A protein has these predicted regions:
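Non-catalytic cap/lid and distal C-terminal segments of serine-dependent acyl enzymes
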Residues: 1-278
Length: 278
């Protein structure tokens, strides 16, 4: 295996950006004979891409399935081109793929590229994936802040929350159509089935304090239900805004992307009977 903490120079933003990568060159050939694809993992607010490799079992899950992981650090940008800050959306969607291909020759085929994220990164994964369905075969959001309009409304009464959004969206907290997941879902659902990405979002049943994350995810699901999506899924189980939940969510996402029964295998491992030595 190989872990790489790269620092890539962004000409677009005139600065360096940290990107963590994992390459699974030691997976069992009898199970996975080749690299199956690349999963881009987006981090949450106040976090970094490296958290995915340090706080979860993402690397082990990637090794089991022959997947390369790419985890860029995009600050508190919500993966948007900020009103008062850097152009992170353009970096993630335009410049980063070029840099990764130049330095690491990663697979570029749509069927081998997936994107997932947690919390702020869950929103980012959905937003990027729905804006670019031609690039990703699968998109997953874990405990995603998927309804920013609702959060803007809450921010009017919570100055601390409002201040999280002002650098990204401006003083009037305007949400452009290209960043509105409800509108993006309607647009993407009009594509032919074979051009739609698989969509998965998960949320813990107890994840509704302060930011009403579960309420946000349920609202997005309700928007999507009547739309002609070919392949989407909303999973929820007991849990909160925490790594334990996101780790399990990644297992379900890999299984959903690859359709290889991986989730059932891991659940079987977790349920294995524990015996106490005499």
């Amino acid at each position: 295996m190989a872990y790489i903490n790269a620092t890539l120079r962004s000409t677009l933003m005139g600065r360096s950006v940290a990107v963590s990568l994992y390459f699974p060159n030691d997976y069992p050939e009898t199970v996975v004979p080749e690299i199956r694809g690349v999963v881009t993992l987006l981090h949450g607010y106040t976090n970094s891409g490296q958290d995915w490799l340090q706080m979860s079992s993402a690397c082990r899950y990637a090794a089991d399935n022959g997947l390369i992981l790419v985890a860029p650090s995009c600050e508190n940008s919500f993966y948007c081109d900020m009103v008062y800050g850097d152009a992170w959306y353009t970096f993630v969607t335009e410049e980063l793929p070029v840099l990764l291909n130049r330095f690491f020759k990663l697979p570029t085929e749509r069927e081998k590229n997936f994107i997932a994220g947690l919390s702020m990164g869950g929103y980012g994964a959905m937003m990027v994936g729905l804006n670019h369905p031609e690039r990703y075969a699968g998109v997953a959001s874990f405990s995603g802040a998927v309804d920013l309009a609702l959060m803007f409304e809450k921010g009017r009464d919570l100055p601390q929350l409002r201040q999280q959004f002002v650098p990204v969206f401006g003083q009037d907290l305007t949400l452009p159509d290209q960043y509105d997941l409800h509108k993006l879902a309607v647009k993407a659902s009009g594509l032919p089935a074979e051009k739609q990405p698989k969509l998965l979002f998960t949320c813990g049943m107890q994840d509704d304090a302060v930011y009403e994350i579960r309420t946000q995810n349920t609202a997005l699901y309700n928007t999507m239900q009547p739309l002609p999506f070919a392949n989407y899924r909303y999973l929820t189980w007991p849990g909160n805004h925490e790594w334990k939940f996101w780790d399990r969510s990644l297992v379900y996402a890999i299984d959903y992307f690859l359709e290889n029964g991986y989730a059932e295998q891991k659940l079987g491992d977790w349920r294995s009977e524990v015996q106490t030595a005499p």
